[in-house]
């Protein structure tokens, strides 16, 4: 496994690799949202059932539009979302037809976040699209909080590590239903 800068990890992601990187609260694992083989690999590493779905993180709202059905949001709902972004708020949004079940799981919606974390911003800007994101842990275990923990837990399983500082959050992102405004976590 190779430690890489955000600008260097683009090739790993585009070739179907799974990468680890710091987020607002914990280290995350991610991959290309348009590569089902990469998503399957990520789910296998985490030992996570596909039915639970995953989160997409992006550097801006435009990157999410190929995946979410923005037309189902009212202007008021859109303004509520934009008032929280970029930041540690994940919104559940309606999906566009044809989105992989590996992303949305058994739901007809998708969890998405525009992150203000500089590493996520840099990776997504390099890719020109969002990144699948999930906490860096095997299901049922605590998430990794440092690049040393990543190396200890995932050596030989992931393809790259972007070391860096975690954000200021001490808990996972708040999850909000974009349509109803209900806080889910």
Swiss-Prot record:
Disulfide bonds: none annotated. One of its GO terms (cellular component) is cytoplasm. Pfam families: Sua5_yciO_yrdC (PF01300). Residues 3-185 form the YrdC-like domain. It is found in: Cytoplasm. Its EC number is 2.7.7.87. It catalyses: L-threonine + hydrogencarbonate + ATP = L-threonylcarbamoyladenylate + diphosphate + H2O. Its main location: cytoplasm. It is an enzyme of class 2 (transferase). Transmembrane segments: none annotated. GO terms for molecular function: ATP binding; double-stranded RNA binding; L-threonylcarbamoyladenylate synthase; tRNA binding. Keywords: ATP-binding, Cytoplasm, Nucleotide-binding, Nucleotidyltransferase, Transferase, tRNA processing. One of its GO terms (biological process) is regulation of translational fidelity. HAMAP family: TsaC. Required for the formation of a threonylcarbamoyl group on adenosine at position 37 (t(6)A37) in tRNAs that read codons beginning with adenine. Catalyzes the conversion of L-threonine, HCO(3)(-)/CO(2) and ATP to give threonylcarbamoyl-AMP (TC-AMP) as the acyladenylate intermediate, with the release of diphosphate. Belongs to the SUA5 family. TsaC subfamily. This is Threonylcarbamoyl-AMP synthase. The gene is tsaC.
